[in-house]
Amino acid sequence: MVSLPRLCALWGCLLTAVHLGQCVTCSDKQYLHDGQCCDLCQPGSRLTSHCTALEKTQCHPCDSGEFSAQWNREIRCHQHRHCEPNQGLRVKKEGTAESDTVCTCKEGQHCTSKDCEACAQHTPCIPGFGVMEMATETTDTVCHPCPVGFFSNQSSLFEKCYPWTSCEDKNLEVLQKGTSQTNVICGLKSRMRALLVIPVVMGILITIFGVFLYIKKVVKKPKDNEILPPAARRQDPQEMEDYPGHNTAAPVQETLHGCQPVTQEDGKESRISVQERQVTDSIALRPLV
């Protein structure tokens, strides 16, 4: 009769032999099928039939619009990804038989996940905050509050905090202190303001006084083109005495016409023709016999 320890050892050897017979090791690019190691299909292809004792694994290339990125034994390839424009996506890299389509976001947006399934608008840094890191295709803008001595007065996707203006460097004084959103306001010192204001005021007063004198002079100056009345134009410097029998008629001009004196009435012009004047001149120059 077999003892119990021997029986246990016998069953252990039997189970070990059975287990070793079924434990077949395949390589990284193989898979176990019906006790045999079959080759996996390479990237860009799919499985059509498993291997047998007489034939190797049968694979077929992926169709257009499909891909397989790894060594596989799948009977179907994967569809290329579609970049949906309504979600703000665009194609960054076209897909191939071995790789999927790569999508990214449009300008001004970034992916909300690692797979870039959706997009979101870049977040601008509000006034009082500056840009620490600008947004990218996969990350949003990183903002930080402006420290003391710096400011940001606008919402921006790229502006950093700017330092306050140094009034001392410009020989000015601080009129208003700066904040995280506003710059320092500089101005002239009190003494300098007085030195500048006094000459300006004096210049304005002198200009006004000069204009006043000029207007006054122009108003008092008589007009050159003023027309005197007829009585003033005809008045002689000295009054003429009236004598009895004084003839005030204008002098009468006499001319010769055909060796006879001709009296020309006042206010009338001489009407002697050129031919008559030549005859008169020839008679006057003829010597007497």
From Swiss-Prot:
Q: Which residues lie toward the Extracellular compartment?
A: 20-193
Q: Positions of the TNFR-Cys repeats?
A: 25-60, 61-103, 104-144, 145-187
Which residue spans adopt a coiled-coil conformation according to this UniProt entry? Answer: none
Q: Name the domain of life.
A: Eukaryota
Tell me what organism the protein belongs to: Mus musculus
Which keywords has UniProt assigned to this entry? Cell membrane, Disulfide bond, Glycoprotein, Immunity, Membrane, Receptor, Repeat, Secreted, Signal, Transmembrane, Transmembrane helix
**Span of the signal peptide:** 1-19
In Swiss-Prot or TrEMBL terms, this protein is called Tumor necrosis factor receptor superfamily member 5
Q: Where is this region: Disordered?
A: 228-251
